[in-house]
Amino acid sequence: MPAPRAAAAAFLLLHLVLQPWQRTSAQATPQVFDLLPSSSQRLNPSALQPVLTDPTLHEVYLISTFKLQSKSSATIFGLYSSSDNSKYFEFTVMGRLNKAILRYLKNDGKIHLVVFNNLQLADGRRHRVLLRLSNLQRGDGSVELYLDCAQADSVRNLPRAFSGLTQNPESIELRTFQRKPQDFLEELKLVVRGSLFQVASLQDCFLQQSEPLAATSTGDFNRQFLGQMTQLNQLLGEVKDLLRQQVKETSFLRNTIAECQACGPLSFQSPTPNTLVPIAPPAPPTRPTRHCDSSPCFRGVRCTDTRDGFQCGPCPDGYTGNGITCSDVDECKYHPCYPGVRCVNLAPGFRCDACPVGFTGPMVQGVGINFAKTNKQVCTDVDECQNGACVLNSICINTLGSYRCGPCKPGYTGDQTRGCKTERSCRNPEQNPCSVHAQCIEERQGDVTCVCGVGWAGDGYVCGKDVDIDSYPDEELPCSARNCKKDNCKYVPNSGQEDADRDGIGDACDEDADGDGILNEQDNCVLTHNIDQRNSDKDIFGDACDNCRMVLNNDQKDTDGDGRGDACDDDMDGDGIKNILDNCPRVPNRDQQDRDGDDVGDACDSCPDVSNPNQSDVDNDLVGDSCDTNQDSDGDGHQDSTDNCPTVINSSQLDTDKDGIGDECDDDDDNDGIPDLVPPGPDNCRLVPNPAQEDSNNDGVGDICEADFDQDQVIDHIDVCPENAEITLTDFRAYQTVVLDPEGDAQIDPNWVVLNQGMEIVQTMNSDPGLAVGYTAFNGVDFEGTFHVNTQTDDDYAGFIFGYQDSSSFYVVMWKQTEQTYWQATPFRAVAEPGIQLKAVKSKTGPGEHLRNSLWHTGDTSDQVRLLWKDSRNVGWKDKVSYRWFLQHRPQVGYIRVRFYEGSELVADSGVTIDTTMRGGRLGVFCFSQENIIWSNLKYRCNDTIPEDFQEFQTQSFDRLDN
């Protein structure tokens, strides 16, 4: 077939083939965007903006395949503003509510919600979800949700979506599924245009066809079209070869004519009138014969002289022609390079570029058609998964020329950014990282914390024996935490590990703590090296450690902590106002405000609105007698006139927004306009203002308070009160001393020493009954500590208190070593029995001999003390033995339970005890005629959660009443 005819036939066939394709192209081909975070093909978020705001766009599909554990929640897909984090579009699964929620920004700047109810999406099974949004650029849009290939719900007449997208594509941020343990996202794609049937087939779903026939026949036509295109390609190949042959023939004829010497046009003489005779033309002039010395051949071509002239050999490799004229061969036409690799035609020869990314192989270079046909470039796929392309312990999927990183392997948790770490869970023994001697605790954010059990110490993953129960092991452990170091006082609890002379022996058990050669009992500076023992003021402290060297001050009190004792400091509180002029000498108050004009500043006035210059406070409740009404309707220890919730129990008096209404009775604790509980709440950050309620991971906790719920700059993991910004760590450094028998001189008052930043208290004297009470008040609380009597010379009472409201109202847990009758029989004979006792103190007389004898006595005393529980073993404490106590108090229901451990063994348990005498209060320690008591490793924690055994106790109580 001549070349022109072949070309015309080819183009005619192409036109005929494309005609049906053009007719069916009205059914647009789906455009698919892979949104998986791990996809190597994942698009830039800014690429979505021009697509979604295209005015011709009428169909958008979101397809996903995932598995969520029971009651899990997750944002599957969302578009947000990268500048202010506002939502443009978001699709969220709410597992606990069996709902899915679609949120998108309308034209008026408000968020529109579409709620799909009764969807079982978080049940630990794999689900396929298809979300179809139609007619988005009009005001009558619709949304259809398909679950596991079946339509589950649809909503009509919706406002426009995507119309609120910013005009700046760079300000759009794309967020997808945030994986949690046991959850995974297998597929996430955004599809624009196309038919529902086409998109559903991407999930291997074959829905009932309700599309027009033209749309449903697209698949058959595609197969027909592919066949026709294959035939067309074959025909075009034949035409190409034919054209190449025609070019060669034409070139040969051109060269032959150019070199032909005998060729020339015939000519005729003019005939005579009688004849017509052809006459040969005159002979042309003789041309000179050419030889090889004139270099007639193409460079590099061998030339041979012959009788008739010269003869040229064949063209060099890489060229084609007659030897005289040679043209470069395009070897790239024979496809020597790997598909997708650029072929560079050289003169002569060719070169293949390097293999594509994800492949490996040589860079091929050669000359000639034969070489190009027989030396094809070979590129082999690189298995990136063997080269650590994905993070360790994650799923890696090798693909041709690339790879894809999937979720963490089973048993691991994390992502490709944070890495995959061993999955931890307290519920699964195989995933529990804790020591067999530790308790596994799951925190609010799903983290796992390990805490060594009673009688053991360490970091929780490794635990060793701890005889004195001060949280330091008897021997050093193979871990790096502070609590892995060897206890420097193995048999004496010292949770601060103080060691003044750094000799490796703790001060608590070092007979010469400062290493000056003078035993502690004779040393006037026990913790300061002073061989000379100089003591200028003749008090009990030598000059080397005396904060007032020339003024006698045995209490060594130093209010402002400046190193100068109050006795010799002319500005005790360090507020810049001299004591003689300061209306609060021991409380900083530069403003010197004094509302009632009694010369006592408001900052330290026990009645700031009632004149009471003597500051008398008989019942030690921090409210002066002049304004103390003792009218307390809710029994939480705060009289009605000062209680910020007079009829609601709230001993802590927490008022987060400082509006004068306590959180317990405030509907909006943070005053951000979102109610704590009722719609449009509940507030996902109840204590931190966040009117927009941003919650990126949809876990029910707002972004602003995710890891620090009360925003007190102490993360929840170590915060003892995560929902109270006023309490962060256990600290008894500030305390109130309460003497319970202030009359008489038979004994002396207790001497309290606070160590380890307020987490350890020591009482050194054989004293009258007394309390050291912290200033922090609690509603529900867990209180624990280590109790140790470090002497063998006495056998009296030691313990702790809770629910302290005043010196006549508190709970006390007290332990007597032996049975003993109190030596003062007035006002009545009091007998103490050995063992642990839980008492409710509600004294009508207050501190004095009646309360003193009532505390000593084991049993109830009228108008003074009630015995709530006594350890039936009647076993006293042992000398120099450590015990650990755990108290749970929930004043809102009257729940009390206390347990004691000796080593790791539970030795006493009060069980559930119900009493509502005191509805919350402060914590502290108690002593009565017992010296050298140590309360070590003290810990308290806010906790209003009602323990499970309370419900069991109530059920049993009702059953007994019924019987």
Curated annotation (Swiss-Prot):
GO molecular function, one term: growth factor activity
Motif placement: Cell attachment site: 138-140, 564-566
First-listed, main subcellular location of the protein, grouped into a coarse class: endoplasmic reticulum
Superkingdom classification of source: Eukaryota
Organism: Mus musculus (Mouse)
Alphabetized UniProt keyword annotations: Calcium, Cell adhesion, Disulfide bond, EGF-like domain, Endoplasmic reticulum, Extracellular matrix, Glycoprotein, Growth factor, Mitogen, Repeat, Sarcoplasmic reticulum, Secreted, Signal, Tissue remodeling, Unfolded protein response
Composition bias, Acidic residues: 662-673
Function: Adhesive glycoprotein that mediates cell-to-cell and cell-to-matrix interactions and is involved in various processes including cellular proliferation, migration, adhesion and attachment, inflammatory response to CNS injury, regulation of vascular inflammation and adaptive responses of the heart to pressure overload and in myocardial function and remodeling. Binds to structural extracellular matrix (ECM) proteins and modulates the ECM in response to tissue damage, contributing to cardioprotective and adaptive ECM remodeling.
Disulphide-bridged cysteine pairs: C292-C303, C297-C312, C315-C326, C332-C343, C337-C352, C355-C379, C385-C396, C390-C405, C408-C420, C426-C440, C434-C450, C452-C463, C479-C484, C489-C509, C525-C545, C548-C568, C584-C604, C607-C627, C645-C665, C685-C705, C721-C942
Subunit structure as annotated in this protein's UniProt entry: Homopentamer; disulfide-linked. Interacts with PTBP3. Interacts (via EGF-like 3; calcium-binding domain) with ATF6 and facilitates its processing, activation and nuclear translocation. Interacts with NOTCH1.
The keyword Transferase belongs to this UniProt entry's keyword annotation: no
A cellular-component GO term for this protein: basement membrane
Gene: Thbs4
Signal sequence, renumbered to the chain: 1-26
Name this polypeptide is given: Thrombospondin-4
Residues linked to a glycan: N614, N650, N943
Residue numbers spanned by region Disordered: 579-676
Start and end residues of each EGF-like domain: 288-327, 328-365, 381-418, 422-464
Phenotype on disruption: On exposure to acute pressure overload, mice exhibit a marked increase in: heart weight and fibrosis, cardiomyocyte size and number of apoptotic cells in the myocardium, deposition of extracellular matrix (ECM) and levels of interstitial collagens. The increased ECM deposition is accompanied by changes in functional parameters of the heart and decreased vessel density. Mice also show defective induction of the ER stress response in the heart.
Tissue expression remark: Heart. Up-regulated in the heart in response to ischemic injury and pathology (at protein level). Astrocytes; expressed at high levels in subventricular zone (SVZ)-derived astrocytes and at low levels in cortical astrocytes. In response to peripheral nerve injury, significantly up-regulated in the dorsal spinal cord (at protein level).
Keyword Endoplasmic reticulum: yes
One of the GO biological process terms: regulation of tissue remodeling
Pfam families associated with the record: COMP, EGF, TSP_3, TSP_C
Cell compartment(s), UniProt: Endoplasmic reticulum; Sarcoplasmic reticulum; Secreted; Secreted, Extracellular space
Chain ranges of the TSP C-terminal domain: 733-947
Family designation: Belongs to the thrombospondin family.
